[in-house]
Amino acid sequence: MFNAEIKERFVKSYSSKISVRTSCKQFFDISQKYEEQWGADLYTRTAEELSQFLAEASGLTTQSRNFTLSILKSYIKWCMTQSDISGVCEDALQISATYSEKFKTQTVTSPIHLQRYLDSVFAPEDDQTIENLYRTYFWMAYAGLNQNDVFKIKNKDVDFSDMVIRYNEKVYPIYREGAKAIKYCVELDYIRSERTNTGKFITIDRIDSDFIMRGRKSVLTLKSMKERTSKKLKEALDKGKTDLRLSYFKVWISGLFYRMFMDELSGIKPDFLPFVKDIDSTKGTKNRLNDLKNRAKYYYEDYQCWKDSLNK
């Protein structure tokens, strides 16, 4: 950490919770790169100078941004009270946590946009490689499935006549753009693999299983899927094939906002409370209901940022 002694003093005074202290230290680890470039501590910078740093240090959601912003402002205010610290820039307290630009580079706007992204990262569907499983993983994210549930979906859960996936008494859409990849995952009992030395494809049998995410030797796990897709996504970004920085969660929230947007275009007022109630398994109490309302409010604020990014 830059100015480690000062920051460690702040962290100790900020919270006694280990989780919060850990988050603070992670925040300052990210700030170190900027502080070394400036040759100065965060507390000396203006709101404008801190904007780019804050965009990197915080996550995508309103809750994450607000938490990160709270640490930053608390640190600056704390520095103002310390007699051995000078040069604190009070203008930094005017910094805002709202920036739709991040949504432009970390979400997709529509199924067409997602398909374009997947095309830039993975092999074409008709090559019939294992990368159709990777595509399907992200299409299930876009449809709204919980990340762990993806690996529990069976062939019988997929209905191409109604273009839906039925699982655990819920219905998830199959988007036209993703149907081919999903169909190959359901129907093919083999995958093709390209030999790098010859450029020719060989056919490999998939394991006998009812699960969609079946590979050559086993059904893929969340751990192996995250490792494989993270590598492919980073490679595409590094090679300039895309400027998007996506993950399962970012694709998932993109799908949530897209469906809400389609409802809004049909005249339905955006309301995330039914959604947060549906995904929350806790029995209702007054305090719990207030918490759900707050979560719905955060989703709505993020949704507005996502909509703003559509016009940029």
Tell me the role of every PLM-derived stretch:
Residues 4-103:
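N-terminal core-binding DNA-recognition domain of tyrosine recombinases/integrases
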Residues 58-59, 120-128, 154-163:
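Solenoid-like repeat scaffolds
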Residues 100-117, 170-181:
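DNA breakage-rejoining catalytic core of tyrosine-based enzymes
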Residues 152-184:
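Conserved tyrosine-mediated DNA breakage-rejoining catalytic core shared by Y-recombinases
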